[in-house]
Regions:
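Conserved pre-motif I regulatory segment
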Residues: 1-23
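Conserved Walker A/P-loop ATP-binding site and its immediately adjacent core
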Residues: 53-73
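Conserved helix/coil segment N-terminal to the catalytic DExD/H
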Residues: 86-116, 130, 134-135
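Conserved helicase ATPase core of P-loop NTP-dependent helicases/translocases
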Residues: 88-90, 255, 265-297
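Post-DEXD/H (motif II) to motif III coupling segment of the RecA-like Helicase ATP-binding lobe
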Residues: 127-187
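Conserved interdomain linker/interface between the two RecA-like ATPase lobes of SF2 helicase motors
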Residues: 167-244
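A short beta-strand element within the Helicase C-terminal
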Residues: 293-296, 302-317, 323, 340-345
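Conserved segment of the helicase C-terminal RecA-like domain
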Residues: 331-358
Length: 466
């Protein structure tokens, strides 16, 4: 466990002593799955010690998230069952990972309610104010509930209280970056007078959640001129780097893919209709460097775990702070050799929501903040010096400008491990306990200081100084 994860866990257990329903905010890329895996292990250890049958339910709303949670639980050797669609169920396991749609379906409610669930963990908990989630509180009355999200925010301004009794927030993104836990970035955006922003401002068709209608976005934003400007900004600012482009729809993805493919790049598209095995193959090939760019439709907004992303390009306008921060957050996972992530905001989202590292009033959003009172950042060009570094487009008079960035990434702080990821915990244990590797050798393997290795081993109960 990283120090901030241990602090978070302690805060959550302390809050549970005073109330039942806790919402925890933690930025994308900072290891929430590792956190709640550790929470599950502690609950299981306590229940075993006290001979108490304590069942735990983990809830997600998409099959991709369920699969990812299951894979992580396997990595941490936590036996579990899955309750999702037509998948085979093993209700004997004390941990169950469930789809919210399946577990609240009327055909399953009676059987599931008999499981005597004592703890519930809700992933991507910004969705949990929906009616389908509220059924959980009725089905498992008296259970301790933990909601985990990077963004406790609702587009309509409705809050999370009193559904949740308390909000616990982690440190802001700016601190995670300065301490080396998240990657620095260079953020480029179009100006408020750009063609893209002016086009978006004229769209007045919205879906049931309040975001732009896909059909309206396709009509206005999927044009040859705007797509050419996407490619142009990539060529000028991120050429040769691998990353993710967020698109509007399948059709928009295909159009973008063709533009980049003709420019000589290895590009694939992924959406909800892409078969799971094919999707995993693409992601693996991306990690191995066989694919340069993945163009996707919302699939990688939630739950995509790949630290190798060197650039993010926003080609899909949104009115959702949740989507915006999740999308840019995918590029902030640190990895060896990665100095910065390049973020290309070709739709001007930062003008509405601010930069990723801005400190936000999560407590206000938790209690409820009307949409009309939510901050709009139209003055970023003045307040952040937009235009100090300008790049002219080959066509038109608009510019993509550096809004925020770092000249020199922060050095590795004392006793920190910036590129450490959750899989390293298992590898460290195997090398130290099973293979008998020395502290000196482990420090060399993990490219860090001996004191860092000792500190991690001490926290895991594997090492004591004589």
């Amino acid at each position: 466990m990283r120090p901030y994860q241990q602090e978070a866990k302690d805060s959550i257990f302390s809050a549970w002593e005073e109330c039942d329903n806790v919402l925890f905010q933690m930025p994308t890329g900072t290891g929430k799955t590792r956190l709640f895996s550790s929470i599950i292990s502690d609950i299981k250890a306590w229940s075993t010690l006290h001979s108490f049958d304590c069942r735990i339910l983990i809830i997600a709303h998409r099959i991709e998230l369920i699969d990812q949670i299951s894979e992580n639980l396997q990595r941490y050797r936590i036996p579990h069952g899955i309750i999702a669609g037509g998948r085979e169920r093993d209700l004997r396991q004390y941990v169950q990972v469930a789809s919210i749609q399946t577990i609240t379906h009327h055909a399953n409610v009676d059987a599931i309610s008999e499981l005597d669930i004592r703890f519930i963990i809700i992933d991507e908990a910004h969705h949990s104010v929906a009616n389908s989630y509220r059924k959980l509180w009725k089905m498992f009355e008296g259970a301790k509930i933990l909601g985990v999200t990077a963004t406790p925010w609702r587009m309509n301004g409705s809050g999370f209280y009193p559904l949740y009794d308390r909000l616990i927030t982690s440190k802001p993104i700016k601190e995670f970056i300065s301490e080396g836990w998240l990657s620095p970035y260079n953020f480029y955006s179009v100006k408020s007078q750009s063609l893209e922003v002016q086009t978006i401002s004229n769209i007045n068709e919205f879906d049931i959640e309040g975001d732009y209608k896909v059909s309206a976005l396709e009509k206005e934003m999927d044009t040859m001129q705007i797509r050419a400007r996407l490619l142009d900004s990539y060529l000028r600012l991120a050429k040769g780097k691998k990353g993710i482009i967020y698109s509007i729809s399948r059709k928009h993805s295909e159009h973008i893919r063709e533009e980049y493919k003709q420019a000589g790049f290895k590009v694939v598209t992924i959406d909800a209709n892409t078969p799971r095995d094919e999707r995993r193959l693409y992601v693996q090939r991306f990690k191995n460097g066989l694919i340069d760019i993945i163009v996707n439709v919302d699939i990688f907004s939630e739950g995509f775990d790949c630290p190798d992303i060197e650039f993010i390009q926003l080609a899909r306008p949104t009115r959702s702070l949740v989507k915006y921060l999740q999308q840019v957050g995918r590029g902030l996972r640190p990895t060896e050799g990665k100095t910065t992530c390049i973020i290309l905001d070709n739709v001007g989202s930062c003008l509405k929501f601010g930069l990723p590292n801005e400190e936000r009033s999560w407590e206000e959003f938790f209690m409820g903040k009307p949409e009309k009172e939510q901050t709009d950042h139209k003055n970023y060009e003045a307040s952040f010096g937009l235009g100090t570094k300008e790049i002219d487009y080959t066509e038109g008079s608009d510019e993509l400008c550096l809004v925020d960035g770092v000249e020199n990434p922060p050095s590795n702080p004392e006793n920190k491990t910036p590129a450490w990821n959750d899989a390293d915990d298992d590898l460290l244990r195997v090398l130290f306990v099973e293979k008998g590797c020395s502290i000196n050798l482990l420090a060399s393997v993990f490219k860090t200081k001996e004191v860092v290795i000792k500190d991690i081993l001490k926290r895991k109960g594997l090492f004591t100084e004589c």
